[in-house]
Amino acid sequence: MSASESAPSAPPVKGMRKNGKNWHDSKKPFRPTAGMTSYAKRLEARKHQEAVKEHERELKEEKEAERQAHIQRIKDRRAAKEEKERYDKMAEKMHRKRVERLKRREKRNKLLNS
């Protein structure tokens, strides 16, 4: 009896299907890429991906820095233009020497405050 008990515990024969549809292929779990890449290859691909992302991040930061520098140049230019217009408006009302004296005083104050 021990021989008959050990027979059912053995795995079923590959050729015979349980439901009797032997003309169909036996079903297997659908894992097309499972186990195809080794751990070392996955690590290498991950490192490569990280390097690419880091490079992209650096490029983005560089581009953003250029953009901010451009914006700052525009702001500085506009501020200088406004200041010049203000001095011109003052020059219309006052004498030239007094305007120059005020300019110097404002520059001194600006340097002291900054």
Curated annotation (Swiss-Prot):
Subcellular localization(s) per the UniProt record: Nucleus, Nucleolus
Annotated GO CC locations: nucleolus
Entry keywords, A to Z: Coiled coil, Nucleus, Ribosome biogenesis, rRNA processing
Coiled-coil spans in chain: 40-101
Residue span of region Disordered: 1-96
GO annotation, biological process: rRNA processing
DNA damage recorded as keyword: no
Keyword field contains Nucleus: yes
UniProt feature, compositional bias: Basic and acidic residues: 41-93
Family stated for the protein in its record: Belongs to the CGR1 family.
Biological role stated in the UniProt entry: Involved in nucleolar integrity and required for processing of the pre-rRNA for the 60S ribosome subunit.
Name of the featured protein: rRNA-processing protein cgrA
Species of the source: Aspergillus terreus (strain NIH 2624 / FGSC A1156)
